[in-house]
Amino acid sequence: MKRLLTVALGFLVSVGLWGQTAFEEIAQQPSKAGGIYHMYPESGFSRPTPAPKGYKPFYISNYGRHVARFNSSNSMYDRFDQMMQKAHDDNALTEKGEDFYRRYHAQYPYCINRGGDLTEKGANQHRGIAKRMFTNYPSVFKGRGRIDARSTNVPRCILSMDYFCDQLKRLNPKLEIEKTVTRDDMAFLNPHSLVNPSVTPTDEGYNNKYAYWQDNYKAMCRENTNPEAFFSRLFKDWNYVKNFTDDPMKLEIDFYYLACSNQCLDYEESYWDLFTQEEINLLWEADSYRFFCSKGPDDIQGGRQWAFCKTLAEDFVKGAEKDIEEGRCARLRFGHDIAIMSFMTLMNIDGWSTPAPTPHDAKDLWQDYNVQMGANIQFVFYKNRKGDIIVRFMNNEEDVLFPIESAIAPYYDWAALKAYMEERIAVAEKIIATTQAPPKK
């Protein structure tokens, strides 16, 4: 009983249920304001919960998000340089604006044509995750263990797979790792792509312009931004920015994304000083709400988006069965944040699956910074001498509890966990069959 209480208390701490609000978390750890650009920690992980007596780990199945990268938009970097250079030449900048101009002008050459590229910080993130996995589960990666590694066909994910697998090979050169990159795997590695036969063009991606939730998201953006106040600190006349955009609100949000993504770069520069703390909080809230609506438990679309992730759930189940039968020691997958968001919601994990009564309630129920650069989910399989199999599930290397009974939580009987996952897959199939893709507007 004492052990179960310890696990439960650890889980409560890990999901922030001691009354701390999201804004308080951001004040305590400012990098969380970066949302999905939040950096994966290098240390501070809980010690693995001891397995029941007689059980040893023998197989791992994971899904890892790519690690730290540049902002995905090359054009954003270019537009900022062109705008600030012109404003400087026109003597249109305030003292604070000139300071930003000097700092950004120095950074810009480092960013040219690097949109979406991984950084060395990112490479080190996956080396660290791989090393901890190897160290925590040496019995999995012993001898000539065979590993199946797969990535989406996006370069940053392929490189993430390489960094991870290369680290494992350095730790045990005998490992036999087969790496695969094929469009066919996108159906489960990127469940919101058109390779998934359930997805239509108006369902595709994470920010589809036809999505049912876009109106709610845009309304929050209008409420949470103040372009006049923000740009008045940078430009002598804030209306000057209208020479470069017909949507000052979006430009303010782009400044926020620049600040978010800069923490991922090897180039040391921060732009959070451009914002007040209230602006940071509100901009983060709107961005997190976008993902909450798109791939989280917002009920405006009836669960359709997270239901697409049934393909990943199916691959976890079928892949584990296949690998255990054929003697592999691990199956490693590398992809994107939205798959992890959707999977956690699909599995009805506490802290990931609660709808918000109002848009502004979402921020304290669900936070996008929990799917930071390098975010991951891991199923670790254990067995005893009789061949009984139990599984522990982790999100970002911390134990997570499934909503099913287990006297040995955070460990679960594999047959029971598989049955639960198949139930959730059936729920997802019903949702997809009974909901409609958004119409083209």
Regions found by a protein language model. Name each.
Residues M1-A22:
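Bacterial Sec-dependent N-terminal signal peptides
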